[in-house]
Curated annotation (Swiss-Prot):
The gene is CCR4. It catalyses: Exonucleolytic cleavage of poly(A) to 5'-AMP. Its EC number is 3.1.13.4. Residues 156-167 have a biased composition (Polar residues). SMART domains: LRR_TYP (SM00369). GO terms for molecular function: metal ion binding; poly(A)-specific ribonuclease activity; RNA binding. Residues 168-190 have a biased composition (Low complexity). This is CCR4-Not complex 3'-5'-exoribonuclease subunit Ccr4.
Length: 790
């Protein structure tokens, strides 16, 4: 929905004209440079960050005049032209700030002058002073933005005039600039430049100055960051460990590195040039300025504007911020300064895209632990609050980044009270009972079904080479460490105790040195295949490449046949291979693989094909994922025909098969359509206008009868959870004519999941969650077996 733009401007009595920013740039500049009404009158209009002690006497006098009517009586106009007298609420806000002006609890540098030696605390004071200058000016951000656009238009007009009129135009422009130049000679600021600068722009400017200063620690952090990102820097003194992971870039080629230090303006710019399907919507405005409007409460409808990237609530009389602020997950800038807030809602920590958060001059004493999620934050404006001394010390010494990491790493544990249920499925495909665990379900099953069934788990374990502090800045450092995550993975796999385990993103060295000894100890046989690029690397580096693994219980299965598919090379050797531009430019250089095992189920003597894969990650290459699945299914059909000596399509459909893994494909993708329907619609958005030769000509079709095992209860709410993406991309597909689903591992407790912006965390060691299915082998077993003991 394209919401109408909000009304902006001054609040006024009925029948009174709205003050206008009219006239020349000089007039607009003068209006923007006026001091807040009731603070300083009309003197001293230079826009300079004044020291609080210097302006206190004048501010006190002006506030007294506002409250009492002053020497001129109640009708005396106070403040700049065209701006009305501040109302009682605004005057009370000013009075509150003045009463705290010499309070060392609100201004800790008064009690601890050593804070003034910290460039980070100096920046707090500078920007707090800039923020206070806007107090009382309704919609000040909108005014500044209008001024900026006006000046840009004037500059463009001037350039255009220069090009058309030549020397005559230059002479005229020189005459027009004479007043401005003479003003500069008298020591004034260049016209309009400072007037159009918002608090956010001042913040960026000061951060850039700090980054380019001679401070060795700051320069070091910036240099490290500039090696990794072309978009500037994050915050001063960002720990090197967070920005410089020791992972070869080649190993990261299939993972998207998050750019956490893009300015909010750049973010909008990038969205405008992004492909249509990646844009937020057709919304034309993304900022809302409600500054200095004497607001006491916020309407809940405000938080339906989930498209907002900037929200300005400074200079009001707000005493609380509703928890529904968490809905505004696109926010980059939030200004809450100069209100009466006593606390910040913990739900604000869900707005992980915040880059600039200001709450100068409130009554806030602490910062919620949930702010450890705000890993994109570049500046946190907190001066003027009676904050806990420890928090002040951390931010003064380690900057906002250090504070966020402190909150992240020391947050209290969130209990995981409700584990995932195991859902029993009847032979008719209907959910019947829920059990606390897979083991409890097994204990309640009859022997016949136990004999005819097996359990399978699929899990992307998040290879530790991809789990870098830069990629997962929201995860506590101790919970992201490989030692911790590996132990958690071990606990999960052994607790589920499934008959078959299929893992993706398993490092070769970890497979050989950790998983093989561990799984053999628990009576599993082990299979593995690394991604294609391992073949092109030195032996030492190739051990760091990840791949797919299959583990199966020796007392349940016997290996009949093992194979693997390197999608690109498998297609090149296909008898109908034909070079196309899309194959050469888009698919050929992808190194994704699939691991295949034909296993004999010892209790039934039926052979079951188990396949696990991990498709390419990039959503801009959905056509390549479709191609990879097409190649895999075509290859599997050929193997089945060879091993089972069948050519009839109906016979092929009856061969027991499970295909599972991380398909990086959502429910509306061509990949899912291909599995479900056996082909892809020719004009599907994922493959439209793409040409992969024979694969495209036959619409990637296959003759296998496959369904998603979770179709019995509906796909889970998500299988992959990160701050920027939460959805279903992992699946377990099975041959519906020879296997029946008899049980499924359910969803993660929604209340628990809602408290996080992404995984991994202390309970879930990967950004994916495991899927578990119990299959009954139904081929040759026409009798429907009840699941319960009698």
């Amino acid at each position: 929905m394209n919401y109408p733009p909000p009304l902006s401007g001054f609040q006024k009595p009925a029948g009174q004209a709205v003050p206008q920013m009219v006239g020349t740039p000089q007039a607009v500049t003068q209006q923007l440079h006026q001091h807040p009404p009731g603070l300083m009158g009309n003197q001293g209009n230079q826009h300079q960050p004044a020291q609080l002690n210097n302006v206190l006497p004048m501010m006190m006098n002006q506030v007294q005049n506002v409250i009492t009517g002053g020497a001129g009586g109640p009708q005396q106009a106070v403040g700049p032209p065209n701006v009305g007298t501040p109302n009682a609420a605004q005057a009370a806000l000013v009075a509150q700030q003045l009463s705290n002006a010499n309070n060392p609890l609100c201004h800790p540098h008064l009690a601890d002058p050593s804070l003034l030696n910290s460039p980070i605390w100096k920046l707090q004071l500078q920007l707090a002073a800039v923020s206070r200058q806007s107090l009382g000016q309704s919609n000040v951000y909108a005014r500044q933005n209008a001024m900026k656009k006006f000046l840009n238009n004037q500059n463009q007009l001037g350039l255009s005039t220069n090009g058309q009129d030549g020397v005559q135009s230059q002479q005229q422009q020189g005459q027009q600039q004479q007043p401005s130049q003479s003003g500069q000679q008298q020591g004034q600021q260049p016209l309009g430049n400072d007037a159009s600068m918002s608090l956010v722009e001042h913040t960026k400017q000061h951060l850039m100055e700090m980054a380019s200063s001679g401070n060795e620690a700051t320069a070091s952090a910036v240099n490290v960051n500039s090696d990794l990102n072309s978009t500037g820097f994050s915050t001063p003194n960002t720990p090197k460990a967070e920005l410089h992971p020791n992972t070869p870039s080649l190993l990261l080629q299939h993972k998207k590195l998050s750019q956490y230090n893009i300015d909010e303006d750049d973010e909008i710019e990038h969205r405008m040039v992004a492909p249509t399907n990646s844009k937020h919507d057709d919304q034309l405005w993304h900022a809302l300025d409600l500054s200095n409007l004497a607001l006491f409460n916020l309407n809940e409808k405000l938080f339906h504007y989930e498209f907002l990237t900037r929200l300005y609530l400074n200079g009001n009389s707000l005493t609380s911020l509703p928890s529904s602020i968490k809905k505004l997950r696109n926010l980059r800038v939030l200004d809450l300064s100069h209100n009466r807030l006593t606390e910040l809602p913990k739900e604000l920590g869900m707005c992980y895209q915040l880059k600039y958060l200001y709450f100068f001059d409130n009554m806030i004493t602490t910062i919620p632990w949930e702010f450890g999620n705000l890993f994109n934050l570049q500046f946190l404006g907190l001066e003027g609050n009676p904050l806990d001394k420890q928090l002040v010390k951390i931010i003064a010494e380690k900057s906002v980044t250090g504070l966020i990491f402190y909150l992240r790493d020391n947050a209290p544990e969130i209990p995981y009270a409700k584990d995932r249920k195991f859902i029993e499925i009847s032979a008719d495909g209907e959910p019947t009972n829920e059990y606390e665990s897979l083991q409890e379900n097994t204990n309640h099953m009859n022997n016949t079904l136990l004999k005819n069934s097996f359990t399978l788990l699929s899990y992307n374990t998040l290879c530790h080479h991809y789990a870098t502090p830069k990629m997962y800045r929201f995860t506590p450092s101790w919970a992201l460490s490989w030692d911790y995550r590996r132990e958690k993975l071990k606990e999960q796999l052994l607790d589920f105790d499934t008959d078959v385990i299929c893992l993706q993103e398993v490092e070769t060295l970890t497979y050989e040195e950790y998983w093989v000894p561990l799984m053999e100890k628990y009576n599993y046989s082990c299979l593995f295949h690394a991604k294609t690029r391992a073949k092109t690397m030195h032996a030492k580096d190739s051990k760091k490449v990840d791949g797919c693994a299959i583990f199966y219980k020796k007392d349940q299965f016997q290996l009949v046949f093992q194979d693997s598919i390197d999608f690109s090379s498998a297609w090149r050797s296909h008898k109908k291979f034909h070079r196309t531009e899309d194959y050469l430019n888009r698919a050929m250089n992808k190194d994704n693989v699939a691991l295949i095992a034909e296993l004999k189920h010892l209790n039934t003597n039926e052979n079951v094909w188990v396949v696990t894969t991990h498709l390419h990650w990039d959503p801009q290459f959905n056509d390549v994922k479709t191609f990879q699945v097409g190649v895999m299914l075509d290859y599997l059909e050929t193997l089945i025909k060879q091993h089972h000596h069948v050519n009839n399509n109906n016979d092929i459909k009856k061969i027991p098969m499970v295909i599972c893994g991380d398909f990086n494909s959502q429910l509306d993708s061509a990949v899912v359509e291909l599995f479900n329907s056996g082909h892809v619609t020719a004009n599907h958005k994922d493959i439209d206008q793409r040409d992969f030769g024979y694969m495209s000509q036959k619409n990637f079709s296959h003759n296998l009868s496959l369904r998603s095992s979770y179709g019995a209860i509906g796909e889970l709410p998500f299988t992959n959870m990160t701050p920027s993406f939460t959805d279903v991309i992992d699946y377990i597909w099975y041959s519906s004519q020879s296997l029946r689903v008899r049980g499924l591992l359910g969803k993660i407790d929604e209340e628990y999941a809602s408290k996080f912006i992404g995984f991994p965390n202390d309970k879930f060691p990967s950004d994916h969650i495991p899927l578990v299915t119990r299959f009954e082998i139904s081929r040759g077993n026409a009798t429907q077996t009840s699941s319960r003991k009698v």
